[in-house]
Amino acid sequence: AMYEDNPFWVLYERGIESYYGNHTLSHRVLGTKETVSNISQQDMKQYFDERYAADNTVLAVAGCLDFDEVVAQANSLCGHWPTSGTARSYQPVVPQSDDFTMHLPTLAQAYVALIAPFPGANDDDRYAAALLSHILGGADGSRLHWALIETGLSEDAAAYFDPRDRTGEFLAYAACQPDQLEQVESLLRSEIDGLITSLTESDLERARAVFATASTLSEELSSGRMRRLGRLWTYSGEYRSLEDELKRIS
């Protein structure tokens, strides 16, 4: 219910469902009232037993530790966990082209969103994709900020890159007055179309600095380092140092 009160989230979920079509990625993570209501206690237990098993779990640790001791403790505490034989299947993604309009009479503003294919979380092109998304609509000095927000046409405008396992999507959106929707969408598309040809080395240097700083600061916390290592291992099955990560960003 909380998400249903957020106009952007309503549009986003409907857009993702349309974009991925019959693919499992079109399913809402939190489900719908209908799907949640139809889940039984036995269904939840079966799902937990299948997914939260020893052969489907990654243990990531960071900080001042003794690796051999960590392994011994993990074996002691978790060695008895059963395996379930669960495996991830990778259904081919075929992006769907669709144009739809939702009418919500309680809203005073109009919202527009565009979704397109982008690299996945295990694709090295994700670094370039992240930089492009940031330059286009990831900060106050972004292209969308100057074209739509600073001009007073939009209250909110941004671009995101959402990397997933072996696929990803790009999202650009804006909120505005209904009578300005056509103009805002036109400018939104124009900024996307002209991004590559208008890029400068200064744009890239600033974006690289933002990501490098964020990565470095995150590594100063054990929790941040664990999340990065765990996510990287889950997606690619490899270890990568912060230094290597920074080289890929630059």
Cite the ranges covered by each PLM segment.
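Mature, solvent-exposed C-terminal subdomains and processed small-chain segments of exported/organellar
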Residues: 1-53, 64-250
